[in-house]
C-alpha cells in the first residue's frame, strides 16, 4: 500500500518514517530461512575444518549464529553485508510493496542500489555499535543532490533493548556533514562531533513487516544490543537513474521501469551473476580524515568514546 500524504509529509519534514505492515510475512520468512541455510552450510564447513567444535543445531534464527560466532566470526561472513545474492534476498529487493513506496519518492524508473546490507547485530559485541553517520557520507558526491531512500527492514522485532535504529530528526536538509574515520570495530565513518546537529535522538523500534524509511542525509546510529538475541536486519537503497553510480564498488540493477521494462531484472540468477561478475571501476570520490589526523574541539565527544544509551 502506498504511503499516505500525511506519511509522505512526515518523511520529508523529519527525514524518516516508520511505515508499519508494509512487507508481506513470506518475504521475511523466506529470507530468514535463506540466511539460516547459509549459516548452516558455513558452520558445517568450519566444523569439518576444525575451526568450530559445536554446530548448535538445536538453536534457531535469533540465537544460533551468536553461539557459533563465539568460536569463529567466519560463521556470519557469507551473509554479512552485501554477500548474499540468492533468491530470497533478490525477492526482498524487488518486493512490490517496497517498490510502490520507492516510486512515490524517486519516480517510476527505480534502481535497486548495490549498497544493500544484511546486519547481524550480535549481542554485546562492540562491532555492532555504529556511530552517527549519514549514508551520503559513504557515497560518491554525484548523489548529493538526489534522494536515495534507505529502507531499514527488521528480520525480528527490533526493540530499543536490541539496539534498534536511532535518528536525528529534521537534520537532513543541511547537506553532508563533516565525517571522520573513527577508531572502531564497527563501520568507522562518523559525523565529526563539532558538526553534529544539536538535536534530541529518537529511537525507532520496528517489528517484522515494518520498514524504517530514511533519506541519504538523515543522521542515524545503532547502539549496543544487550538483549541476548541477534538483531537481524537488512537495509536496502533505491534511486532514480539520475543519481548516478554513487557506490561504484558494487553493482545495482533496474528494479522497475516504464521506459525500458525489458531491462528490469526478474530472475535472481541474473542478480547473482551481476554481483559476482561486477568489476569495480573506481572508488567513491569522497575522502575523510582518520581519527588521528582530525582535530576536535572536545575530544571526549569522539564517536569512538562510549556514548549514552537511550533506555
What role is predicted for each listed range?
Residues 106, 137-148, 199-200, 206, ...:
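A short beta-loop-beta micro-motif enriched in histidine and acidic residues
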Residues 1-14, 20-132:
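Non-heme Fe(II)-dependent double-stranded beta-helix
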Residues 140-160, 205-206, 213, 237-240:
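Short, conserved beta-strand element in jelly-roll/cupin
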Residues 41, 211, 218-311:
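Non-heme Fe(II)/2-oxoglutarate
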Residues 9, 158-221:
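Double-stranded beta-helix
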Residues 108-111, 136, 141-144, 154-164, ...:
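Active-site region of the double-stranded beta-helix
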Residues 58-62, 130-135, 185-198, 230, ...:
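Short, surface-exposed loop/helix-turn segments at secondary-structure junctions
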Residues 121, 168-175, 231, 237-242:
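Short edge-strand/loop segments of extracellular domains
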Amino acid at each position: 500500500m502506498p504511503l499516505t500524504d500525511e506519511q509522505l509529509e512526515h518523511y520529508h519534514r523529519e527525514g524518516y518514517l516508520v511505515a508499519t505492515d508494509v512487507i508481506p510475512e513470506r518475504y521475511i520468512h523466506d529470507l530468514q530461512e535463506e540466511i539460516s541455510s547459509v549459516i548452516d552450510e558455513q558452520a558445517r564447513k568450519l566444523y569439518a575444518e576444525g575451526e568450530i567444535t559445536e554446530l548448535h543445531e538445536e538453536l534457531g534464527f535469533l540465537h544460533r549464529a551468536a553461539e557459533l560466532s563465539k568460536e569463529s566470526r567466519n560463521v556470519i561472513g557469507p551473509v554479512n553485508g552485501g554477500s548474499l545474492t540468492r533468491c530470497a534476498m533478490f525477492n526482498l529487493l524487488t518486493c512490490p510493496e517496497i517498490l510502490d513506496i520507492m516510486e512515490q519518492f524517486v519516480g517510476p524508473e527505480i534502481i535497486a542500489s548495490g549498497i544493500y546490507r544484511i546486519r547481524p547485530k550480535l549481542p554485546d559485541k562492540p562491532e555492532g555499535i555504529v556511530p552517527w553517520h549519514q549514508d551520503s557520507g559513504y557515497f560518491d558526491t554525484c548523489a548529493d543532490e538526489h534522494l536515495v531512500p534507505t529502507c531499514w527492514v527488521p528480520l525480528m522485532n527490533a526493540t530499543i533493548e536490541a539496539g534498534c535504529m536511532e535518528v536525528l530528526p529534521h537534520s537532513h536538509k543541511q547537506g553532508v556533514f563533516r565525517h571522520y574515520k573513527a577508531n572502531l570495530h564497527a563501520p568507522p565513518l562518523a559525523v565529526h562531533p563539532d558538526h553534529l546537529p544539536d538535536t534530541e535522538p529518537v529511537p525507532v523500534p520496528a517489528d517484522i513487516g515494518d520498514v524504517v524509511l530514511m533519506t541519504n542525509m538523515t543522521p542515524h546510529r545503532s547502539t549496543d544490543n544487550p538483549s541476548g538475541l541477534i538483531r537481524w536486519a537488512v537495509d536496502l537503497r533505491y534511486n532514480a537513474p539520475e543519481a548516478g553510480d554513487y557506490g561504484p564498488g558494487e553493482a545495482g540493477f533496474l528494479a522497475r521501469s516504464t521506459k525500458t521494462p525489458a531491462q528490469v531484472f526478474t530472475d535472481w540468477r541474473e542478480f547473482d551473476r551481476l554481483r559476482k561478475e561486477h568489476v569495480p571501476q573506481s572508488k567513491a570520490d569522497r575522502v575523510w580524515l582518520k581519527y588521528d589526523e582530525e582535530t576536535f574541539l572536545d575530544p571526549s565527544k569522539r564517536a569512538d568514546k562510549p556514548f549514552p544509551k537511550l533506555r
